[in-house]
Structure formats: C-alpha cells, structure tokens
Design a protein with these regions (language model features):
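Metallocofactor- and cofactor-centric catalytic cores in central/energy metabolism, strongly enriched
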Residues: 1-268
Length: 268
C-alpha cells in the first residue's frame, strides 16, 4: 500500500486529486493507494495540537504502509519540518515529502513521488512472520443485546490466542468500560498498571463531568433498540473483547505499544 498523508486539512482536495490520478495511472501495480483526509494540522494549541502531530507521525511510521507521501502546505502549524521531529529516523526511499506552496504543479509532482514509492514498494516480497510481530486493535460497533455473549467473546478468545503466541492486542473505547472497569483493574499485572488503569478511567469521567455531560448516557438509540439496557450492560460486552489475559500496558492517545500482551489505550 502507498499512503498519502496531509499535514493539514487544507490539502484534502489536493491529496484526493493525487490519489485519483495515481489510482488510474498505477492500477494493478500496487495493492492500494490510500489518502488519509483530516481537518486538523493548523489553528490548534496545546494537547490538541500535540495529539494531531503524534497521530500523523504514527501513520507515517506505520508498518502497513509500503511507502508514504507526506503533503505539507508550507504555512501550517504542523508543517513538515515540525512533523519530522515527531517522525524520528526514517527511510528516505519509503517516505517522501512535498511542500505544495513550493510546487508549480503539486498534483503532478505528487504523482511522480507516488510513482517512486510504488517502484520502491514493488521490490517487496511477502513472507511469513511470527505472531509476536502482530499488533491488533480491537473494536466493536452497532452493539446489541447479544454482542456481549457472541461476537465480543469471540474477539476475546482471539485476543487470548494471539497473546498466548507472543502477540499483542489493544483495547480502547474507554467510555464503554465504565461500570465494568474493575474487571480490567483486577487483571493488571502490577500495582503501577492498576493505578494507570484507574487514572485512564477517571480521566475520561472527569472530562465528561467538566463539560456537564452525564457519564452514563452512552448507549445509543440503536443499542437500546437492540436490547442493551444500560451503560454497564454495554461495558460488560465491551470488556469481553479483552479475553482473560493480564493487562500489561496502558497507553496514552497516540503512544506506540512498548510491551507484548494486552494493552489499554486512552481513546473514545
């Protein structure tokens, strides 16, 4: 896959145009060309800006991308020079940068860079890898009254199997842990992780209350129509995705995984 990642939302139209032209020109020579549109990268401050930069850097460094084209506008807060500080060391053959304000034809220049990336990624060969190299994020959606006794436990069984073979899984959707959080706290590998999990839960609860929002009004009309009676009901289903493995890591938003096994991630 070739990924096109803009540093700022102003470039979504340019990014989309490069993607469409590359799809037409390079059809059949690469698995896919994906454009990651977003509305961020400028007029942000503090933690909001920090999160955007970390997530963009994480996408650029993501192992699922054979090659990455990073588009910058040139005048944005999270410009390419800033992003490079978050990216760290990178392979110049795998990651290409284009500052659009410095280009007379950014769409054509972008296409040429995608061609270079496609040639680079085309030299790769598929090969088996051990389970220990797999990191899988777990997600549920459209939950109903049966999710907690069908699909979610099946995901939990998969998580346990992967972890037993040295792999890693990530559980998030923290507001959907409310009411069932003690099930995860009791499985923390040590006291430090226990305290981090308590903070993970309480930080989200405090965020809700600081904005005068009711914590336990999470279930959607679709959830209720499907048979979910309360947030605790929904949360008991959500936590089933974690299986029975011990909690070995607690991650902040955008933080890379550092340990194998079950990790909890701070995200909505």
């Amino acid at each position: 896959e070739i990924w096109i990642i803009p540093s700022v939302g102003c470039l979504n139209i340019v990014e989309s145009a490069i993607e469409k032209r590359a799809q037409a020109y390079l059809a059949g020579s690469i698995d896919s060309i994906l454009a990651f549109s977003h509305p961020y990268g400028c007029s942000q401050m503090g933690e909001d800006q920090e999160n955007t930069r970390r997530i963009l850097a994480d996408l650029i460094n993501h192992p699922n991308a054979g090659g990455v084209l990073v588009l910058g506008l040139g005048c944005e807060n999270s410009n390419i020079d800033v992003l490079k500080e978050y990216i760290g060391e990178y392979d110049e053959s795998r990651v290409k940068f284009l500052v659009c304000q410095e280009s007379e034809d950014e769409i054509q220049d972008g296409l040429e860079l995608v061609k270079e990336l496609t040639k680079y990624a085309g030299a790769f060969t598929r090969e088996p890898i051990p389970c220990s190299e797999l990191i899988i994020g777990m997600k549920c959606g459209g939950s109903d009254g049966l999710s907690g006794i069908t699909a979610n436990p099946a995901v939990g069984a998969f998580s346990d199997l992967l972890i037993a073979n040295g792999g890693t899984t990530i559980l998030t959707e923290v507001p959907e842990m409310f009411g069932a959080e003690t099930l995860l706290m009791n499985r923390c590998e040590n006291e430090e992780l226990f305290e981090q999990t308590v903070k993970l839960i309480n930080d989200f609860k405090n965020y809700f209350t600081s904005h005068n929002q009711t914590i336990y009004e999470n279930p959607s009309p679709g959830n209720k129509k499907g048979g979910i009676s309360s947030l605790e009901d929904k949360s008991l289903g959500c936590t089933q995705k974690s299986g029975s493995a011990p909690v070995r890591g607690v991650l902040s938003y955008g933080e890379p995984v550092a340990v194998h096994g079950l990790n909890l991630l701070s995200a909505p």
